[in-house]
């Protein structure tokens, strides 16, 4: 026996509802639909054809119906498309309640019931969107289709995929290729195919990204802190994490300074190498900055503000004694080890596993460039290859870098011209920059919930997507609640979570009063024992959405919640056509020009601009040049009338006047018992034979004297010197080469032993005195 309810016993809830509106309200609603009025007008025309007597009356009625329908305010569920240029009565100006001109720029899909288009304006998109949908709901296709809006607008987007599916890159590449913007496409692919990436690969896997190559020390510190593991609930864990954060802040202050000075390439591996206590001691005590595979750098002249944090860190290590440099007791090493071990895991993953992406100087992906120049960035996170914690760290790198870029875009100035401080923000654009975070729960970052609140003024449109609400709550329930509260556009696709996610959408939708039939009664005269309602109704409060409706949605169907409206929608499906060949952009690394060159260029451009503004483009400055003077004189004195022949004659005369005197070849004089760099090998006949294949070539001088002289003349000529002067300089240089490489050297001044000993003692005394002064100075700084 089955006690559950069979489907044939289930009632359609809409059959219990009754329309209690007045006749005029229903009539007005009927004629508000253009399809209905079209049917009425066609019907009136057909009736007038058969009943010509009523044609005049029917014409008047048709005109009234048409005018009524024509004068109705045309609306769509959300916004009218901008191309319509009509007044949008769903988009009223605040305070005066006058309609804005249509501003819809982002197409979401169509109403499933009426087929009406669903558009959102720039301001709406910058209030962000939240999408939930279970597996197979069409969530990824919806997000890809939304990103196509950005391409149509000439904008760009960032798409972070927590599932790590390479088919996503293929779809995005197809869309970008169709718009002719494949040069703007960037890919960060953390997927390694379950193998180690060592050395060059046959095919490129990813563009490069180095989050440490730019940004302030505080921004990079926060990035590292976000990668650190949770300290747990213990107070000891909080204490050790706090000390680790203090160490990172102190270290980053110095490393960022040295990076900006061009002394080091700052990446994850470089930072990890400076965890060594001996290196820290060299920096603080010896005032020497050690570098990997390079000479150390003297840092005595850098500001104390940069080195003081590291000095204070060492001084606060329990048991640390600066007098025992390099030989600290085990307690100091343990204390330092407890601090650095909290950082090793994150940096090992970045520097080793993903070194082919992170360990680079001029990275191809610069988030500031990506956002300001509206590029397209796709990030693939390996959900199957990595543990949840590791996957979270990779996502945090992207999200934290994006957050830091947003912080820089907010600006720090509050004083100055309004146009410079406010209107010239780098992201004031008529279209939003989309940040699509698919499966955000896998890589949620603590503190990212403030982004929806701040990103609106920066022109960002953050679209959070996931399968359910509990995934968002892994990082923090408060963060998840804040994201839900700060996203005005909420979309629920196929839903299978009947608990927290369902409660979230139920509360979002709210309740409404409806009129329902009270009861049914049997019709006494009916043989089939049919039921009829009792012609009475009452109202009750019901939820505006039903869980079964959300569960029965097919791929691409969704409920869209915006303000107080709920629209059952069929989402836009871009369906990009696959391309035959996929590729990853490869860029040429070019160092930025130095600051002094930029200042010089700016002055030159300013001077050129002032010349253009003055309107006087003539050059009155006399340039003294002997060649130009000679050619000008020859042209003036020439009696030839034909311009071309006169010019040729002037050039021939100039060439004849400036023809260089022939320079004789220099012959190296062979001095017995002496050698120079221009000497040939002289072989003693009695010496053992030289075991070489070609003795003549082997016996040639290291530098042929005449070829060297000719090359020097060429260099001088390229530098602007005349032939005569160039030959003289070359001969002088050849003589200098001969003197400098002459062997045996000439006898030099002889110094006796006592005098040499005295000089050495004086030098030693001066060195000792300088060292004592340096030690006293260091002791005074520490005290």
From Swiss-Prot:
Key words of the record: Cell inner membrane, Cell membrane, Membrane, Protein transport, Transmembrane, Transmembrane helix, Transport, Virulence
Cell membrane listed as a keyword: yes
InterPro entries: P-loop_NTPase, T4SS_component, TraG-D_C
Primary site of residence: membrane
Topology with respect to the bilayer: Single-pass membrane protein
Residues passing through the membrane, by range: 47-67
Localisation: Cell inner membrane
Region (ATPase domain): 100-500
Pfam families: TraG-D_C (PF12696)
Gene Ontology cellular component list: plasma membrane
Record flagged with keyword Phosphoprotein: no
UniProt record, GO biological process: protein transport
Region (Interaction with IcmS/IcmW): 671-773
Subunit structure, as described in the record: The T4BSS is a complex nanomachine composed of several subcomplexes. This subunit is part of the Type IV Coupling Complex (T4CC), a subcomplex composed of the DotLMNYZ core and the IcmSW-LvgA adapter subunits, linked by the C-terminal tail of DotL. Six DotLMNYZ hetero-pentameric units may assemble into a hexameric nanomachine, forming an inner membrane channel for effectors to pass through. Interacts directly with DotM. Interacts directly, via its C-terminal region, with the type IV adapter proteins IcmS and IcmW. Also interacts with DotN and LvgA via its C-terminal region.
Function according to Swiss-Prot or TrEMBL: Component of the Dot/Icm type IVB secretion system (T4BSS), which is used to inject bacterial effector proteins into eukaryotic host cells. Part of a subcomplex which recruits effector proteins and delivers them to the core transmembrane subcomplex. Plays a central role in the assembly of the subcomplex. Required for the recruitment of IcmS and IcmW to the inner membrane and for the translocation of adapter-dependent substrates. May have ATPase activity.
Protein name per the record: Type 4 coupling protein DotL
Organism: Legionella pneumophila subsp. pneumophila (strain Philadelphia 1 / ATCC 33152 / DSM 7513)
């Amino acid at each position: 026996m089955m006690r559950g309810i069979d489907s044939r016993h289930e009632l359609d809830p809409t059959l219990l509802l009754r329309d209690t509106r007045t006749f005029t309200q229903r009539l007005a609603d009927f004629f508000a639909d253009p399809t209905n009025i079209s049917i009425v007008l066609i019907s009136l025309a057909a009736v007038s054809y058969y009943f010509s007597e009523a044609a005049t009356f029917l014409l008047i009625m048709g005109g009234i119906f048409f005018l009524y329908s024509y004068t109705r305010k045309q609306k769509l569920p959300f916004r009218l498309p901008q191309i319509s240029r009509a007044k949008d009565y769903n988009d009223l100006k605040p305070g005066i309640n006058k309609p804005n001109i249509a501003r819809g720029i982002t197409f979401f899909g169509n109403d499933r019931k009426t087929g009406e288009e669903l558009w959102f304006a720039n301001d709406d998109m910058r209030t962000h969107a939240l999408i939930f949908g279970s597996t197979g709901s069409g969530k990824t296709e919806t997000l890809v289709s939304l990103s196509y809006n950005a391409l149509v607008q000439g904008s760009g987007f960032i798409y972070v995929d927590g599932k790590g599916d390479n088919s996503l890159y293929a779809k995005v590449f197809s869309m970008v290729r169709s718009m002719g913007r494949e040069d703007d496409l960037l890919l960060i692919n953390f997927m390694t195919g379950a193998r180690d990436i060592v050395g060059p690969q046959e095919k490129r896997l990813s563009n490069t990204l180095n989050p440490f190559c730019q940004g302030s020390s505080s921004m990079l510190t926060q990035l590292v802190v976000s990668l650190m593991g949770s300290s747990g609930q213990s107070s000891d864990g909080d204490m050790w994490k706090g000390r680790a954060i203090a160490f990172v802040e102190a270290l980053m202050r110095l490393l960022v300074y040295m990076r900006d000075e061009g002394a080091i390439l700052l990446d994850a591996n470089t930072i990890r190498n400076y965890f060594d206590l001996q290196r820290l001691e060299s920096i603080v005590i010896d005032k020497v900055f050690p570098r990997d595979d390079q000479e150390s750098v003297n840092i005595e002249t850098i500001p104390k503000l940069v080195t003081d944090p590291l000095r204070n860190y060492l001084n606060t290590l329990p048991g640390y004694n600066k007098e025992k440099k390099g030989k600290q007791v085990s307690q100091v090493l343990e204390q330092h080890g407890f601090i650095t071990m909290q950082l090793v895991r994150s940096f090992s993953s970045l520097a080793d596993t993903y070194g082919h992406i992170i360990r680079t100087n001029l990275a191809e992906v610069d988030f500031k460039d990506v956002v300001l120049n509206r590029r397209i960035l796709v990030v693939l996170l390996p959900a199957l290859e990595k543990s949840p914690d590791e996957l979270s760290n990779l996502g945090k790198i992207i999200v934290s870098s994006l957050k830091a870029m947003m912080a820089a875009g907010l600006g720090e100035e509050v004083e100055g011209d309004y146009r410079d401080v406010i209107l010239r923000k780098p992201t004031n654009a008529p279209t939003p920059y989309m940040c699509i975070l698919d499966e955000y729960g896998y890589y949620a970052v603590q503190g990212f919930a403030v982004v929806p609140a701040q990103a609106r003024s920066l022109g960002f449109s953050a679209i959070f997507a996931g399968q359910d609400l509990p995934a968002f709550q892994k990082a923090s329930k408060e963060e998840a609640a804040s994201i839900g509260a700060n996203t005005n556009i909420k979309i629920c696709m196929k839903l299978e979570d009947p608990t927290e996610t369902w409660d979230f959408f139920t509360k979002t939708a709210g309740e409404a009063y409806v009129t329902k039939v009270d009861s049914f009664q049997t019709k006494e005269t009916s043989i089939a024992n049919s039921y009829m309602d009792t012609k009475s109704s009452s109202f009750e409060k019901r939820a505006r959405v039903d869980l079964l409706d959300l569960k029965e949605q097919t791929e691409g169907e969704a409920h869209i919640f915006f303000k107080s409206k709920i629209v059952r929608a069929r989402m836009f499906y871009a369906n990009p056509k696959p391309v035959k060949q996929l590729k990853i952009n490869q860029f040429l690394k070019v160092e930025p020009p130095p600051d002094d060159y930029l200042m010089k260029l700016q002055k030159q451009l300013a001077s050129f601009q002032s010349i253009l503004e003055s309107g006087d483009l003539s050059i009155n400055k006399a340039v003294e040049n002997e060649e130009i003077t000679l050619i000008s004189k020859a042209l003036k004195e020439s009696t030839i009338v034909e311009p071309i022949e006169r010019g040729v004659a002037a050039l021939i005369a100039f060439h004849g006047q400036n023809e260089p005197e022939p320079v004789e070849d220099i012959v190296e004089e062979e001095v017995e018992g002496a050698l120079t760099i221009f000497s040939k090998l002289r072989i003693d006949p009695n010496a053992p034979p030289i075991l070489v294949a070609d003795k003549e070539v082997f016996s040639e001088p290291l530098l042929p004297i005449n070829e060297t002289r000719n090359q020097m003349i060429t260099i001088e000529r390229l530098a602007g010197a005349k032939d005569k002067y160039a030959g003289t300089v070359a001969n002088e240089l050849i003589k200098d080469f001969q003197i400098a490489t002459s062997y045996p050297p000439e006898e030099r001044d002889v110094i006796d032993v006592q005098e040499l000993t005295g000089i050495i003692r004086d030098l030693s005394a001066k060195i000792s005195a300088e060292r004592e002064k340096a030690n006293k100075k260091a002791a005074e700084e520490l005290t």
